[in-house]
Amino acid sequence: MLTPLATLPYRHVLTLPTEPSAVRIARETAELTLNGWGIGLQHPSIDPALLILSELVTNSIRHAAAHSPQVTVIYGAGRDRLVLAVHDTHPYRPPLDGTVVSTGAGGGLATVMELVLGLGGTAVVRADVMVGGKSIWITLPL
């Protein structure tokens, strides 16, 4: 189930150039933002969430930089859930199902899906009809 971002009391948006430093900045911003929201970094979902975020931003840099000069990271949280999204303007929407794991392609996405499903979360790829591209939305229980 996809949580509408507007229903979450905590939200933050970060737009970065699609370059390698974006991974570190997105992760550090997540740590600072979560801490500011009172979500301790020792929570069992946070380390996997940070790895998921790093993988998604890395994928945007590696596969979308030619089409997408920027990557946007969306952070959201409520009492019982954490939402992360990564948006780029590359038109390709990768599958987030068993084919990611079974074909061996998309190793980063296979890791993402293993972590998301292991935590009881959800992952959805949504097309962006306004500016093109897609967003990958991750929802994890807290």
Regions found by a protein language model. Name each.
Residues M1-P17, I61-L142:
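Conserved beta-strand-loop-beta-strand hairpin that lines the nucleotide-binding pocket
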Residues V23:
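Primarily the active-site beta-strand->alpha-helix module of PP2C/PPM metal-dependent phosphatases
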Residues L32-S54:
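Conserved short strand/loop->alpha-helix "switch" segment adjacent to the catalytic nucleotide/phosphoryl-transfer site
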Residues P20, E55:
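Solvent-exposed, flexible loop/coil residues
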